């Protein structure tokens, strides 16, 4: 085994001391750096093959920035990101291109993430075309199969995004993410813009797809109740740092950090006595 090959037991994704700082600049004639925003400040976590790691925190906690740094959509300030044992931090877009087949992303806003000028068939099929996986009638067949698999119809192939509801648009985004048969899917707040009833449908769909395709998820959300439902393990992020990490049951039933307890207390619970117990961490 060479240095770039990972053992079967190695994590699919291993993030160590990931840092992303944004400079604050001021000046009249010449900008100079006066401070930094520490959006991600020494974050470490692993995602195993076929599992879901939930990354939870309020808006501004740094979780989405961390995901973009993992995918090299923004350049990390420092730290290590290994995918299947290979260091990918600092790789250029050309070097990352083959890895895009293995690492895909589902975005938060199903309205903004789909090009309104393109038909659904183009949106879902573009990754297949760019990577040279399929073309012509074979491309159409694969896209239509994906649409059916995510709960849409093959007849939706020629429609435009504005003809769909928010939940249906997110299904289109999921189909696009799965088109290249990735090993890791980063789900960046994939249900936060949807109604509660639709959220449950999308989460259940993601569960089913994980079982069918052996996917690993990094599932990002601010609602720890949703995160607990889908995750094997949870990492809680606050002010750019991970403050608590463990199994989903351990983090939600026996939280140690005050910030985790705060997130749990915000989850709607029918019995107010249970809510008080959660606040106390009991």
Describe the function of each predicted region:
Residues 2-11, 24-32, 36, 247-282:
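Short catalytic/signature loops enriched in Gly
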Residues 29-34, 88-104, 130, 137, ...:
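ABC ATPase NBD coupling module
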Residues 79-87:
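Conserved ABC transporter NBD signature motif
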Residues 87, 138-155, 264-265:
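Conserved ABC ATPase "signature" region
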Residues 160-164, 168:
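Conserved ABC ATPase signature
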Residues 179-183:
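A short, proline-enriched helix->beta-strand linker immediately N-terminal to the Walker B motif
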């Amino acid at each position: 085994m060479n240095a770039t090959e990972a053992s079967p037991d190695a994590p699919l994704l291993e993030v160590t001391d990931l840092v992303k700082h944004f400079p604050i600049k001021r000046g009249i004639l010449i900008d100079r750096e006066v401070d930094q925003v520490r959006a991600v400040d020494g974050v470490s976590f692993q995602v195993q093959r076929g599992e879901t790691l939930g990354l939870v925190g309020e808006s501004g906690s740094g979780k989405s920035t961390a995901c973009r740094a993992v995918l090299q959509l923004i350049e990390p300030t420092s730290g290590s990101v290994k995918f299947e044992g290979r260091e990918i931090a600092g790789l250029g877009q050309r070097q990352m291109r083959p890895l895009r087949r293995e690492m895909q992303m589902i975005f938060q806003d199903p309205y903004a993430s789909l090009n309104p000028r393109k038909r659904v068939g183009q949106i879902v099929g573009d990754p297949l075309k760019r990577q040279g996986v399929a073309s012509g009638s074979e491309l159409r067949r694969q896209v239509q199969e994906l649409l059916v698999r995510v709960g849409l119809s093959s007849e939706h192939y020629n429609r435009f995004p504005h003809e769909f509801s928010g939940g249906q648009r997110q299904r289109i985004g999921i189909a696009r993410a799965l088109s290249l048969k990735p090993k890791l899917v980063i789900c960046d707040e994939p249900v936060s813009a949807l109604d509660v009833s639709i959220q449950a449908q999308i989460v259940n769909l993601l569960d089913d797809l994980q079982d069918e395709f052996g996917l690993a998820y990094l599932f990002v959300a601010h609602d720890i109740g949703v995160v607990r439902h889908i995750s094997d393990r949870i990492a809680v992020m606050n002010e750019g740092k991970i403050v608590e990490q463990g199994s989903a049951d351990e983090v939600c039933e026996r939280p140690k950090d005050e910030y985790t307890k705060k997130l749990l207390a915000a989850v709607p619970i029918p019995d107010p006595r249970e809510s008080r117990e959660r606040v106390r961490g009991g």
